[in-house]
Design a protein with these regions (language model features):
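Hydrophobic, helix-rich cores of sensory/ligand-binding and other regulatory modules
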Residues: 1-225
C-alpha cells in the first residue's frame, strides 16, 4: 500500500490510497493501476483498466487501513476456499457456497439444458426450480425456458464471454452472468441474481475469477456431463 503523490511514477504492484476530493481528469492517464479511493469523488476520472476499491464516508487513517485489511482478508479467504474445493468431491457446491459472502446475492449455475447444477441459497423472488420427472434432477421451469428461447436479448447473451449483465426486462431484476466455455464449447452459465444487494463493479471481476475455477473443474471432473 502506498499514499498517492501527484507526479510520482506509479507501479502496478502497489495499491495507492487517494482521497476522493483530490480526483481529477488527470487520473485518466494511469493504466492498470490499483487505487483505494476514500470519501466521495468522481470515479469516472479513472481509466477502465484501473482497479478501484471505494471506501465511502469520512474515516480516520486507522479505520481506512482496517477496512483495507479486512477486504484483503475476505478475498484471501475466498481464494483459499476455491483452491480447496478443486480437490473436493463436490467442488461446484463448495465454490458457490463460498461465494455467497462475496456477491451478497444468490448464486447458481446451470448447464446447456437449464438443469440446475448448484444453487446453495434460494431467496424470495428467485425462480422455483422443479424436479424433472425423467431425470429426477432440478431444472428451470419450462415456462421460463420458453421465455428465454423467445427473448432476443437472451439469445444475444449466448455468445458472450466474461461477466455481463442481463437486464431486468424479462425477470424483473438484473442478472450478472458468465457463460462457461471449455475448448470453445458452451457448457452452461454462472448467474448472480440482483435480489438482495446492488451488483457492484467489482463483482464483474469476481464472477470471472469464480468462473475460471469452475471451467477448470469442468475440465478435471466432467462436472456437466
Amino acid at each position: 500500500l502506498r499514499i498517492y503523490q501527484a507526479g510520482a511514477l506509479l507501479k502496478p504492484c502497489y495499491l495507492y490510497l487517494v482521497f476522493g476530493n483530490s480526483l481529477s481528469e488527470s487520473f485518466l492517464r494511469y493504466q492498470n493501476i490499483a487505487f483505494v479511493v476514500v470519501g466521495s469523488g468522481d470515479l469516472s476520472c479513472f481509466s477502465e483498466s484501473c482497479r478501484i476499491l471505494h471506501i465511502k464516508g469520512t474515516l480516520s487513517f486507522s479505520e481506512v487501513f482496517n477496512q483495507i485489511q479486512q477486504t484483503f482478508d475476505r478475498y484471501s479467504d475466498w481464494d483459499s476456499k476455491l483452491q480447496l474445493a478443486l480437490g473436493s468431491i463436490d467442488p461446484l457446491n463448495e465454490m458457490l457456497e463460498a461465494s455467497l459472502d462475496i456477491f451478497h446475492n444468490p448464486v447458481f449455475a446451470h448447464d446447456t439444458n437449464f438443469y440446475i447444477l448448484s444453487s446453495p441459497r434460494h431467496v424470495t423472488g428467485m425462480s422455483e426450480w422443479v424436479h424433472d420427472q425423467r431425470t429426477g434432477r432440478l431444472i428451470a421451469p419450462l415456462s421460463l425456458i420458453q421465455d428465454f428461447k423467445l427473448d432476443a436479448e437472451y439469445q444475444r447473451t449466448l455468445i458472450t464471454h466474461g461477466a455481463n449483465i442481463y437486464s431486468e426486462e424479462l425477470r424483473g431484476y438484473r442478472i450478472l452472468y458468465m457463460n462457461l466455455w471449455v475448448s470453445g464449447n458452451y457448457q452452461g452459465r454462472l448467474c448472480v441474481d440482483e435480489l438482495q444487494t446492488e451488483i457492484q463493479p467489482g463483482h464483474f471481476s469476481a464472477l470471472e475469477y469464480l468462473g475460471s475455477f469452475i471451467e477448470l473443474c469442468i475440465r478435471r471432473h466432467n462436472l456437466f456431463q
